[in-house]
């Protein structure tokens, strides 16, 4: 089009002059048609100046130069005596850009693509570029199977040579795959091969991955999957000969045919490594060992290459090249693998930098590093630093970037890019419950206090049965070696009878201090001392309580009792989770225990063990299986029993969902005469008149507990990728029990269950939603108990909520 205009302009110029071949001297230059473009700008873009002698070639160059500015739709150059007359038609200016009918592509993405092509508000409109954009968008829709889609650019003229640009989309429907055929397969059935595809011609209801909607990109991925399937089973000569994609006449159905040549199976005859091994030939040789007669496997070859790169990366060779060349012997059906290695230069770390830590101090991040500045670059050390930052729980994401230092052949900077999350929470609540009455709760918890890494918490609860307050502080780096120091003080006034537990009141206060000693990257030992004062009152006779009082030398009808205990607290934590919150891979084991020491009124020990294992079942870690267990056991020492107020409890959102908190397990069996006061309005149970006691629904807990949970974590529907790291959905199956190993069935009426039996397992199943919301960690769960016992109390819907800054 431009050349046609150039030719017309040249002809006009030739016809306007009588001596074009000899040229003429330009005395003046005039423009016609300029509106937005200044005369000076137009003159600067021209190769001709006043006083120049010009000919036909100069005029052609002038026209080309003016078109090249992108400001003009049409250019003509005429001669009027010695004056050069330039007639132009400016391209219109885009006043606005709107979209209509686009559902698959967001407006923001369209604007970005248009701007990349130079189409934006305030710029001139190039109709040729617009045609290319229309075609490109239609090609995109074709690639995702929408072959009836169309995109039209509607240009509406406005005053002052401006236009409104509107892109009108008719997306149509996605073509569905009617049939997938594989031609040339003999070793494996078509059904077996297609079962590994994302694209399917039939998708059962339970298959959440398969898709009948055609997408060019998915087909390319499926073809690569097909290639890998054969190469991993020894078919070294496998080849995809051709692929045909055919449309039905109505463009709503697609037939896919893949033509392949399987070839024969080949076995590896050996691996030969050569090149610059940087002195690590022995270690590399271990990575290339093969079993005699092993089938050729493409995935194993790729893994071997990656393992060699990782090995060299640990020794500072940041950019090694590893290339494998298979030598195929068709005569004996073997493959000899020749591996060429070039370790390259060894790199050293000049600086370690952190980006994105607006709250956390650099020192908090730097102390987690295992890579040192000035040392050679160790890829494993850099990765360890990333893992440790993730496990802090301060960040949503942690990424690393190794940047070469300009002008240096062997230096790099390591950059950790973090995205901080809200680590502090303030929660305040006012509620009313049938058991608790009016309830007030407030708390402040900051796991990264002022960016120092300190964990500080202040919590309090006030309701009809409890007044509780606690202050806790932990310094994770009390020493430079990573020894942590934590402590807390607390006060608790607890009236168990109003909480649907056995009848007693306990006013307690205490303090403890704990040191944590890191053993290695994943293991920490803890040791500390604690003190607690318990003052019990309003105790009503029940069998478990009677046993404890008698072991302490008190009579069964004692209604008040006080005890001061000093404890040695200990623990062990193994943590190999991939991050501190919403993990998707790895395991965590936490063992805690305490035992009373001389000077204590009570003599007992108590141990609990928590485990959690996350197993991703896809490469993106969006589908994860979680297994959790919790075990607890305690008992008395020196002929004494463990205090009943130290018992284990189960039920609620942290143990067995679907049951009310702390209601699973043994129930109180009250002795004769309990609550016979006619003025006592406690109606948890009828007045007991049996000499041997009577049962109730008041939970007393037990000295042994076992809880297990199996959870299937799935992508949350309708949540964009931006918020995927803040929301988690899961389906779960919980089970658990609490029992009393010291229970004597002969001490209770015949209608009371045997509370020493660990087989009374409760079970429930349901769905949970967790959200790191602006209000703090928020957890919803709905569970249905499907195995329960008399006295158990169901609570299907449960949630926790707080507020975060």
Curated annotation (Swiss-Prot):
InterPro entries named in the record: Bac_surfAg_D15 (IPR000184), BamA/TamA_POTRA (IPR010827), D15-like (IPR039910), OM_assembly_BamA (IPR023707), POTRA (IPR034746)
Signal peptide start and end residues: 1-20
Alphabetically ordered keywords of this record: Cell outer membrane, Membrane, Repeat, Signal, Transmembrane, Transmembrane beta strand
Record bears the keyword Signal: yes
GO biological process annotation, one example: Gram-negative-bacterium-type cell outer membrane assembly
Keyword check for Repeat: yes
Entry's localization field: Cell outer membrane
Gene Ontology CC: one annotated term: Bam protein complex
POTRA domain segment(s): 24-91, 92-172, 175-263, 266-344, 347-421
Pfam entry (one): Omp85
Subunit field text: Part of the Bam complex, which is composed of the outer membrane protein BamA, and four lipoproteins BamB, BamC, BamD and BamE.
PANTHER family referenced in this protein's UniProt entry, alphabetically: OUTER MEMBRANE PROTEIN ASSEMBLY FACTOR BAMA, SORTING AND ASSEMBLY MACHINERY SAMM50 PROTEIN FAMILY MEMBER
Function according to Swiss-Prot or TrEMBL: Part of the outer membrane protein assembly complex, which is involved in assembly and insertion of beta-barrel proteins into the outer membrane. Constitutes, with BamD, the core component of the assembly machinery.
NCBIfam families: OM_YaeT, PRK11067.1
Family of the protein in this entry: Belongs to the BamA family.
Name of the protein in question: Outer membrane protein assembly factor BamA
Organism phylogeny: Bacteria, Pseudomonadati, Pseudomonadota, Gammaproteobacteria, Enterobacterales
Name of the gene encoding the protein in the UniProt record: bamA
